[in-house]
Amino acid sequence: MFKKGDILIRNFSMGDFLIFKEYDGEDELVSYWDMAFDRPVVEQNIRSWYVDSVHLATEWELEWFFEDLKREGLRWNAKTKQVEKIPTM
């Protein structure tokens, strides 16, 4: 079972990440945010992820995820469950 804020990655993907929000029925889930390797745009509240199609990100995958966010000028705030722009000086 996934917990709110868990960072997941789609099985057999090249870097399709999502941040778990809640279950939607028995076999689907809703995410706070979604980011795919082929579109660096981060989208909010994507539906229709099948539970069987994702897994909890490994340490290596987490590093990859956070680096991708950083490259886009973003960061994950685990406390507020928001993707935020990194402030510039």
Please name every model-derived segment:
Residues 36-89:
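Intrinsically disordered, low-complexity, charged/polar segments
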